[in-house]
Structures are given as structure tokens and as C-alpha cells.
């Protein structure tokens, strides 16, 4: 991407397309004020104070036609999100009016922004680093308040600060090692340098490994738990799904095989987003459509983070029940004995001891499912510690793992008695890898790819 294109004036609709109370068309760049003024009838936007909202009308400069009655926000560089002049035109919501204003601005000299380009400019102008830019999208995509809390902390710079501090410490260590090698003042300088490198490398490794330990929790809160609801036909899987969702999404009848495919929905369980997959009942069937659903159910079971196995407590165990118990035994599984409001006939002695008796009809013990999920995945600890920094982004996790591997190579080399100057290479590589997280050492291709995943207008 050319420098000219990076820093021309861009525009986009920043609110979702469709009907709504308010629509926002955003401008950013050197000519933002002049372009906005060319279609605005009201105060002179190039003379108003920064961070003010100004009433007026958007007009077509060629015909003089009024397009809409608007409020225009003016924010002057550098105290803006992009650190450029920014104008936001607040219109009445609607596809026609926002698109008409957008086309006017483009005709007056603005360029249509690419996905994520406003945030990309904030990054290029030093307003945010790469982790903070990614946090913007995480906030937009957050499915629960806990996921949003983690993203907001990242946007606030908690992860950036930790990474930058570690990189600085690594740089200080490399400088000290270099001085000791090039300007030895003591006879035992080699032993001193080796001891320093061992101490600091172990310190860095411990810090990054502690950060990695937050990844499981952070990733779950960011992306959710893929949860398969399995069981033979007509044991109450769809009723359980509807109960958790608190709305009727799945067909509930007394006819076996009414769920003929996989139904997916998200539900918030105490701050954890569960991607609930209601599977077709797993059984032998001659119905071709249902057979396809059964095969998809087996695949969903294999890929799930969590399995909710539903059994009918009012009937004796069947061969299908036993097959599902065996099939799911290596999974993170919660066994639910449904229909406990009826006479119990199931053989409890043939089941593991950790089952939960429930009644979807009466809501009995549904809350215990949430408690068991907390026990399985969070060791009964709180989901988010207020002052903790969490890894939740797969890119960050992968790079931290690579950084730890580089530090392990340094420690292994020290144990083998390798020369310190050779081990500097791996420590330098650790410093570079951590720089990829914040964007200080990230290739242009990666930056372009990351911002292309953003929505238009952000």
C-alpha cells in the first residue's frame, strides 16, 4: 500500500447498515474538515473548536438539495482515535440517507475506507499498538461481559505493557552480556556472564509461562466453549437446548428423530459463551436425511470442548445409552439424567458417580450445570481476576509459545556449555518474537491481513 493511499482522507459508514435511530458517517484525514464543510450548511466546520457537535444540514453542493438534518462532530488531530482530523456526521438512521451522504463525501474527494482502516491508521500513527488494535475487534465481537472485560483491559494496554517491559529487560540483558564479552574487567567474566544469562533467561521463561497459563481461560471467554448436547432420540436434548436459551429454537415432540440435523446457538452461562450444538439423536436409522444428521452429531461430539450427555431417568439404560457413555468417556463430559419428575427406572449403579439429576420440565437442578462447567474448566475459581492479564488471542498465544521455545534453547545451550555469544542469537530471537505481538517487529503482510478482518467504518 502506497504512502499516499495510507494518508489520504478516508470515509465510511460506521454504524450497521439498516434502519435505526442514528447513522454515523466518519471521515479521517488532513482534508476531513474541508470535505465535510463542502457538503454542510451550518457553522464553518474549519473554524469551530475541537470536540464540539454542530447542528446543520447536509446538502448536495451541485443541486442545493437538502439530504438530511444532522449533527456533526469535529475532532482535531492529534487528540482523536486516528491522530488525524476526524469528522463524524450523525444522520437519521437508514440505508438511503447514509449511503447518499457517503457518496457525496467521495465525490468531494474522500476515498472509501478499507475494512479496519481507521484502526489501522491509529496503529500507524502510534495511537495504539497491534494488541490494542486487535482488542478493538474483540470488544465488538465479545459475546459476554467477561469477554468484554478482558478485551477492554487489553485495549487499555495491560498486555502491551507486560510485553514491552519484558522486551526492555531482554534488551538490557543482551547489552550487559555484550559489554562483558567485549570489555572483560575480571578473570572470571565468562562465569559471571553465564550466571547472568541463566538467571535472566529463567526469569523471562517463568514470566511467559505464567502468562501462557491464562490462555485456556482467556481463549474460552473470548471464543466460547463448543458444547455438544448428545443422547439417543427423545431424551430431552432439544428441550434442554430451549431451556438454556430460554426460547424455542428446536422442535420438541414425542416423535423420535425430530431433530434431523445439528442446531447451533450461543448462550451466556455465567459469563462463559457456550456454543450449544443440539445434535440429532444418535441411533441406527434408514432415513437418509436423519442418517446425515447422525453422522454430523458424531463429528460434533469429536470436536466439542464440552459434552452434555442426556439420559432418560424414567427408562432403563439401552445399548445406545451405553454406546454414548463409552463414546464420550474421554471428553469433558457432564451426564444429565433428565425426566426426574417421572418415576425413576434408570440403573444408577451402572453410571459414573458425577451425574446430575435434572428435569427440563420443572427446571430442577439446571443451575448445577453451570456450577459443573465452572468446576471442569476453571477449577471453581472466579472467571476473571480483576488485575490479571489474560492471553485470549490465538496469534498472541502462538507467539508466546515460540518465545518460550527460544528461551528453552538458551537454557539448554547453557547446560551444554555452549559459548554465550552463540546463545545471544536465541535471546535476540525471543525479543523479536515478542515484538511481533505488539507490532514493533511485525511484517507488513501480517498487519494488512489483521486489519482486513475488521468491519467497514472501524
Swiss-Prot record:
CDD domains: trmE (cd04164), TrmE_N (cd14858). GO terms for cellular component: cytosol. GTP binds at residues 234-239, 253-259, 278-281. Its EC number is 3.6.-.-. Its cofactor is K(+). Disulfide bonds: none annotated. It comes from the Bacteria. Binds 1 potassium ion per subunit. Its main location: cytoplasm. Residues 224-378 form the TrmE-type G domain. (6S)-5-formyl-5,6,7,8-tetrahydrofolate binds at residues 26, 88, 127, 458. Keywords: Cytoplasm, GTP-binding, Hydrolase, Magnesium, Metal-binding, Nucleotide-binding, Potassium, tRNA processing. The keyword Transcription regulation does not apply. Transmembrane segments: none annotated. Pfam families: MMR_HSR1, MnmE_helical, TrmE_N. It is found in: Cytoplasm. K(+) binds at residues 234, 253, 255, 258. InterPro entries: G_TrmE, GTP-bd, GTP-bd_TrmE_N, GTPase_MnmE, MnmE_dom2, MnmE_helical, P-loop_NTPase, Small_GTP-bd. It is an enzyme of class 3 (hydrolase). Mg(2+) binds at residues 238, 259. One of its GO terms (biological process) is tRNA wobble uridine modification. Exhibits a very high intrinsic GTPase hydrolysis rate. Involved in the addition of a carboxymethylaminomethyl (cmnm) group at the wobble position (U34) of certain tRNAs, forming tRNA-cmnm(5)s(2)U34. Homodimer. Heterotetramer of two MnmE and two MnmG subunits. Belongs to the TRAFAC class TrmE-Era-EngA-EngB-Septin-like GTPase superfamily. TrmE GTPase family. PANTHER family: TRNA MODIFICATION GTPASE GTPBP3, TRNA MODIFICATION GTPASE GTPBP3, MITOCHONDRIAL. This is tRNA modification GTPase MnmE.
Amino acid at each position: 500500500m502506497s504512502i499516499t493511499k495510507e494518508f489520504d482522507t478516508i470515509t465510511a459508514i460506521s454504524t450497521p447498515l439498516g434502519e435505526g435511530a442514528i447513522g454515523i458517517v466518519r471521515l479521517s484525514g488532513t482534508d476531513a474538515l474541508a470535505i465535510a464543510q463542502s457538503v454542510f450548511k451550518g457553522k464553518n466546520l474549519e473554524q469551530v473548536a475541537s470536540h464540539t457537535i454542530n447542528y446543520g444540514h447536509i446538502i448536495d453542493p451541485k443541486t442545493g438539495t437538502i439530504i438530511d438534518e444532522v449533527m456533526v462532530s469535529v475532532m482535531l488531530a492529534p487528540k482523536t482515535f486516528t491522530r488525524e482530523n476526524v469528522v463524524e456526521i450523525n444522520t437519521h438512521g437508514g440505508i438511503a440517507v447514509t449511503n447518499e451522504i457517503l457518496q457525496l463525501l467521495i465525490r468531494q474527494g474522500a476515498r472509501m475506507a478499507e475494512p479496519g482502516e481507521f484502526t489501522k491508521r491509529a496503529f500507524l500513527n502510534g495511537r495504539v499498538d497491534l494488541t490494542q488494535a486487535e482488542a478493538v475487534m474483540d470488544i465488538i465481537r465479545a459475546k459476554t461481559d467477561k469477554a468484554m472485560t478482558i478485551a477492554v483491559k487489553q485495549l487499555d494496554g495491560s498486555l502491551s505493557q507486560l510485553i514491552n517491559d519484558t522486551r526492555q529487560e531482554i534488551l538490557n540483558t543482551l547489552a550487559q552480556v555484550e559489554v562483558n564479552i567485549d570489555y572483560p574487567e575480571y578473570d572470571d567474566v565468562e562465569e559471571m556472564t553465564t550466571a547472568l544469562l541463566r538467571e535472566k533467561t529463567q526469569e523471562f521463561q517463568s514470566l511467559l509461562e505464567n502468562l501462557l497459563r491464562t490462555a485456556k481461560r482467556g481463549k474460552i471467554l473470548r471464543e466460547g466453549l463448543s458444547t455438544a448436547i448428545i443422547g439417543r432420540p427423545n431424551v430431552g436434548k432439544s428441550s434442554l437446548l430451549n431451556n438454556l436459551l430460554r426460547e424455542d429454537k428446536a422442535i420438541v415432540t414425542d416423535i423420535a428423530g425430530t431433530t434431523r440435523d445439528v442446531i447451533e446457538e450461543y448462550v451466556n452461562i455465567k459469563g462463559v459463551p457456550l456454543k450449544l450444538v443440539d445434535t440429532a439423536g444418535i441411533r441406527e436409522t434408514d432415513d437418509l436425511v436423519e442418517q446425515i444428521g447422525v453422522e454430523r452429531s458424531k463429528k460434533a461430539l469429536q470436536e466439542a470442548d464440552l459434552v452434555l450427555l442426556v439420559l432418560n431417568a424414567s427408562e432403563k439404560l439401552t445399548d445406545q445409552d451405553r454406546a454414548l457413555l463409552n463414546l464420550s468417556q474421554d471428553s469433558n463430559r457432564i451426564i444429565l439424567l433428565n425426566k426426574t419428575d417421572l418415576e425413576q427406572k434408570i440403573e444408577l449403579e451402572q453410571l459414573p458417580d458425577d451425574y446430575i439429576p435434572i428435569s427440563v420440565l420443572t427446571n430442577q437442578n439446571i443451575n448445577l450445570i453451570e456450577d459443573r462447567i465452572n468446576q471442569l474448566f476453571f477449577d471453581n475459581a472466579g472467571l476473571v481476576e480483576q488485575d490479571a492479564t489474560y492471553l485470549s488471542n490465538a496469534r498472541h498465544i502462538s507467539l508466546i509459545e515460540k518465545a518460550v521455545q527460544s528461551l528453552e534453547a538458551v537454557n539448554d545451550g547453557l547446560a551444554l556449555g555452549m559459548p554465550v555469544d552463540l546463545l545471544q542469537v536465541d535471546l535476540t530471537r525471543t525479543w523479536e518474537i515478542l515484538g511481533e505481538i505488539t507490532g514493533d517487529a511485525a511484517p507488513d503482510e501480517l498487519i494488512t491481513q489483521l486489519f482486513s478482518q475488521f468491519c467497514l467504518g472501524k
